[in-house]
Each structure stands twice: as structure tokens, then as C-alpha cells.
Curated annotation (Swiss-Prot):
Protein's UniProt name: Melanoma-associated antigen B4
Stretches for region Disordered: 1-110, 315-335
GO cellular component: cytoplasm
Keywords for this protein: Cytoplasm, Phosphoprotein, Repeat, Tumor antigen
InterPro entries on file: MAGE (IPR037445), MAGE_N (IPR021072), MAGE_WH1 (IPR041898), MAGE_WH2 (IPR041899), MHD_dom (IPR002190)
UniProt source species: Mus musculus (Mouse)
Superkingdom of the organism of origin: Eukaryota
Stretch list, region 15 X 15 AA approximate tandem repeats: 334-554
Tissues expressing the protein: Expressed in testis (at protein level).
């Protein structure tokens, strides 16, 4: 065919595609006008579809690498989008956060958009807990694309599995109905495990990618430009992701995956996003780069500048692990977390963790102190130790309250090759008076020699009661248990009962200690229970619930 005729043929094909798109838009608007109701999953994007979470919306190679411009420049050199269209990002010109991957082939570019439309439909049906039918899929992408449906569905399935960890499965062979199933172990090991429910966590990896490609900090305008490409707009509730501003500035910030802060020297004030500490802890720049590369059907080396940065990040992490605190086998890890919740006033909290490793003998101590002169406090401290030998753990929580309600919780968990576990919890709630509660659990394991100690002290200024319970077990294959209860009451009558049961059979031992306090005038109850069982497999738990109908006090 002569060159001129080829050009005319290409022009006719391009005009036909544009006419098809325009016809789809008119059909969708006509249907919406006739029905007069909110669109469903099958017609919401029939004509005015956005890219959703297709590859067209994800960050791609940066301008600095000699590729097509995709990521927004940090300041004045940013690419700008055409604002002529009011229908959404679909009709915008090429921008820094979006470049049509098949711009040289209108047919492939159209299939990419259809993939995004089908993805949004499938996610919508998943959220509604309804199966997706092949007939509705054809309505979404237009029946003209019936022959291309298998290819479009395959691409949409790959993207959904990559981003959300959801697999598209046919309910019955050749049945024409599909559903999304969560994959507990996605083939891509890049996904983050968050406490956020689906689908909020689906945006996390792409957002971290945008921040990474923008010099490890992205302005709020750049983030919204990227989200707009996905059909997510500020102030508009998204059918899949809900309220987007709350998601990125509150939920992901609260989970410590993102940092949302004011840009330095900005006037008027503007804000930016950075990786949060949890993002640095749970993923790496290389994993994010691998994610972006897979989305764009390329390799991490296609981002040379960022690939070099990701390699440096890997080296720095390896050096930090080698020089820092021990982390494997006989080397131990300790983590202390303190969480304070305050809606109206100021708190003070201090958490300390000490690790000593000498011949695989480990010690860890966590302390939390709360001081509140006038309001309500919450504090939580958690310490976890793990290796392969002997462990000791102590957790102490002192509470001081001058006038109001306090809550403190301390939890210690030990795990090693002898399968030892020790757990201590302290909860204190005071509605009318000053209380103090202390619980200690110490566990030492050396060739089936075990010791467990539980101690509870209660102090009530109105009734002046004290109760102590102590249980000690020791010596290989021979066990002794002692329980002591001491009551001191200057103003009211108290009753105390202590029971100890021992069962010994081939190193399988159980010891139980119960302490009950009954005060007719104050109505207090305290119970302590310690259980040990199975040879070389030990568990010790100490629980002390206290109920005071006058003071409403509980201590465990």
C-alpha cells in the first residue's frame, strides 16, 4: 500500500476510536438520564471511565532518567495537565504522574483504559459482596470489545492481584460468573501487611512509590494530582476508597506509614508527604521499585537513578543490622511501645528497655510511668524477646493519680526453644479513689527446672486492705507449692481463702493457687491463678481481677 494510503488508513482508525469513545459517553449519559438514579457497578464507568488503578495511573520512569516524563518535578519545573476537560482525568493531556504507555498505538491505549474500567467494576462488586458476570463486564467496556474481553480481563486480574492481593476466580467453569478471593500469600512479596481493611490499604504501595520517585518527599499537590489520575478527588467520597483525605492524612498517618507535615519556609503554608517509620520498617525502597517496575511491565533497572538509591538503601540496612542490636539465633530483639491517648490535656510517659546478652542469657525490662495531675491517661507498654536459650523478663507499671481515672496495661511475652511463655497483665480503673496495683511474673527455664512467682499487692485508702499471693515451684521432677495470703484491715471485716493443688506425673506438673477476698463493707474480690504444665513446655499466667462496688476498682 502506498505511504499516503497508509497514513489515511491510520487517520480513519484513529477517528473511529474517538467516535466510539464519544458514542459510549452519549450512551452512558442517556442511560443515566432515563434511569434518574445513582449508577451501579455495571454502568458507573461506561462512558466516563477513569483510569482507576490500571497501569495508566501509576508512577513511571522519571524525567531525570531520560525517559518519558511521568513523575512531577519537585518545584517550578513540574509538568502541567490540561484543565480543559471537566469530566475527569481521562481526557487530560500527558502529565507528570501519567503517561499513556501505548501512546503510539491508539488501540492499545484504549484497551488500557478499558482495563481500568473493568478493574473498578470488579472492585465495586467485591465491596458489594456480589459476583461479577461476563454480561455486565461487556456493558462496562462496551460490547464492541467482546473479542478483546479475555485479554482485558486478564490484565485487570493481574493488576488487582498485584495491588490488592486479590485473585479473580471463576465461580464455575464456563459459568460466566467471577469473584475476588483474598490471597494470604501473594506471589509478589512487596505488599505491606497493614491493619487497615480492604480497600484502603490498596493505595499504600503506589503512594510510597510516588513519594520515592519525587525525591522521598511529595507535596500534597503532587499526591492529589496522582490520585486524580486514579479517579480519586479531594472532598469527594470514592465508591471504593471512601473519604480520600481522611485516608491519606489521618488513617495512614495514624498507622505511621505516612508523615504529613508542613513544608519548610512555605508561605502560604503548604504540606508534604514522606514515608513514615512503619513504612521504613516493613518495606524497602527496592521492594517499592520492584512493585513499580512490575506494574509498568519492566525491571527496576529501568529506573537507573532510583535503582542506585535503592541499592544504597539495602547496603545501609545491612550495615545497620550488622553493627546494631543482635537480631538472630542467640541474639535477641527487644521492642518497647508506649501509646498515649489524650483528647484534652498533656501527658508524660517514659518507656525504658534494657537488653543484656551474655552466653545467651537475656534480660529485658520495660518501665512505664504516667503522671497526670488533673485528667484521664492511657498508657500501654509491650516488650517481646526472642532467641533460643534462657530468658528473664520483668514488667513494672507504677501509676500515680491525684484526682481522676487512670488506665495502665503492661504485657510481656517470652518465646524460646523450650517453648516458655510468661504473660503479665495489669489493668487499673479507678472512678473514686486512689489505687495501686503491681504484678510480677518471673520465669527461668534450665533443664526442666522451673520457677514461677506471682505477687499481687492492693492498696485501698478508704478501706486499708492488703492482699498478697505468692506461689513458688522448683526443683527437677520435684515440685513444691506455697501460697501465702496476708490481710490487713483497720476498719472492716475481711475473709480470705487460699487453695493449692499439685499434680506430678513424669515431669508433668500443675499448680494452682486461688485467693479470694471478701469484704462485707467494701465488697472486694481478688483472685490469683498460676498454672504450669507439660515437660519442658511451660506456661505461667497470673490474673488478678478486683471488683469494688463502692470504688469500682479492678486489678489484674
Amino acid at each position: 500500500m502506498p505511504r499516503g494510503q497508509k497514513s489515511k488508513a491510520r487517520a480513519r482508525e484513529k477517528r473511529r476510536l474517538v467516535q466510539d469513545e464519544a458514542q459510549e459517553l452519549q450512551d452512558a449519559q442517556a442511560k443515566a438520564g432515563e434511569k434518574g438514579k445513582s449508577p451501579s457497578c455495571s454502568n458507573q464507568d461506561s462512558g466516563d471511565a477513569v483510569a482507576s488503578t490500571s497501569t495508566a495511573g501509576f508512577p513511571q520512569k522519571s524525567k531525570s532518567q531520560g525517559e518519558a516524563p511521568t513523575t512531577t518535578a519537585r518545584k517550578g519545573g513540574a509538568c502541567r495537565r490540561s484543565r480543559k476537560s471537566t469530566r475527569g482525568p481521562r481526557e487530560e493531556s500527558t502529565s507528570c504522574t501519567r503517561v499513556p504507555r501505548f501512546s503510539e498505538n491508539p488501540q492499545n491505549d484504549l484497551l488500557t483504559r478499558k482495563t481500568g474500567m473493568l478493574m473498578q467494576y470488579l472492585l465495586c462488586k467485591y465491596k458489594m459482596k456480589q459476583p461479577a458476570s461476563k454480561g455486565e463486564m461487556l456493558k462496562v467496556i462496551n460490547r464492541r470489545f467482546k473479542e478483546q474481553l479475555p485479554e482485558i480481563l486478564k490484565k485487570a486480574s493481574e493488576r488487582i492481584q498485584l495491588v490488592f492481593g486479590l485473585e479473580v476466580k471463576e465461580i464455575k467453569p464456563n459459568g460466566g460468573y467471577y469473584t475476588l478471593v483474598s490471597k494470604l500469600d501473594p506471589s509478589v512479596g512487596n505488599a505491606l501487611t497493614t491493619s487497615l481493611p480492604f480497600p484502603q490499604n490498596g493505595l499504600l504501595m503506589p503512594l510510597l512509590g510516588v513519594i520515592f520517585l519525587n525525591g522521598n518527599r511529595a507535596s500534597e499537590a503532587e499526591i492529589w494530582e496522582f490520585l486524580n489520575v486514579l479517579g480519586i478527588y479531594d472532598g469527594k467520597v470514592h465508591i471504593i476508597f471512601g473519604e480520600p483525605r481522611k485516608l491519606i492524612t489521618r488513617d495512614l498517618v495514624k498507622e505511621k506509614y505516612l508523615v504529613y507535615q508542613k513544608e519548610a519556609n512555605s508561605d502560604p503554608p503548604s504540606f508534604e508527604f514522606l514515608w513514615g517509620p512503619r513504612a521504613y520498617a516493613e518495606t524497602t525502597k527496592m521492594k517499592i521499585l520492584e512493585f513499580l517496575a512490575e506494574v509498568n511491565e519492566t525491571v527496576p533497572q529501568a529506573f537507573p537513578t532510583h535503582y542506585e538509591e535503592a541499592l544504597r538503601d539495602q547496603e545501609e540496612r545491612a550495615q545497620a543490622e550488622a553493627v546494631g542490636s543482635p537480631g538472630t539465633s542467640a541474639k535477641d530483639k527487644a521492642e518497647a511501645k508506649v501509646t498515649l491517648v489524650d483528647s484534652s490535656c498533656k501527658y508524660q510517659a517514659e518507656s525504658k528497655v534494657t537488653l543484656v546478652d551474655s552466653s545467651c542469657k537475656d534480660q529485658a525490662e520495660s518501665k512505664v510511668t504516667l503522671v497526670d495531675p488533673s485528667c484521664k491517661d492511657n498508657a500501654k507498654s509491650k516488650v517481646t524477646l526472642g532467641s533460643s536459650r534462657k530468658y528473664k523478663a520483668k514488667s513494672k507499671v507504677p501509676l500515680v493519680d491525684s484526682s481522676c481515672k487512670d488506665q495502665a496495661e503492661s504485657k510481656v511475652t517470652l518465646v524460646d526453644s523450650c517453648k516458655d511463655q510468661a504473660e503479665s497483665k495489669v489493668t487499673l480503673v479507678d472512678s473514686s479513689c486512689k489505687d495501686q496495683a503491681e504484678s510480677k511474673v518471673t520465669l527461668v527455664d534450665s533443664s526442666c527446672k522451673d520457677q514461677a512467682e506471682s505477687k499481687v499487692t492492693l492498696v485501698d485508702p478508704s478501706c486499708k486492705d492488703k492482699a498478697k499471693s505468692k506461689v513458688t515451684l522448683g526443683s527437677s521432677h520435684k515440685y513444691k507449692a506455697k501460697s501465702k495470703v496476708t490481710l490487713v484491715d483497720s476498719s472492716c471485716k475481711d475473709q480470705a481463702e487460699s487453695k493449692v493443688t499439685l499434680v506430678d506425673s513424669s515431669c508433668k506438673d500443675q499448680a494452682e493457687s486461688k485467693v479470694t477476698l471478701v469484704d462485707p463493707s467494701c465488697k472486694d474480690n481478688a483472685k490469683s491463678k498460676v498454672t504450669l504444665g507439660s515437660s519442658r513446655k511451660y506456661k505461667a499466667k497470673s490474673k488478678v481481677p478486683l471488683v469494688d462496688s463502692s470504688g469500682k476498682d479492678k486489678a489484674v
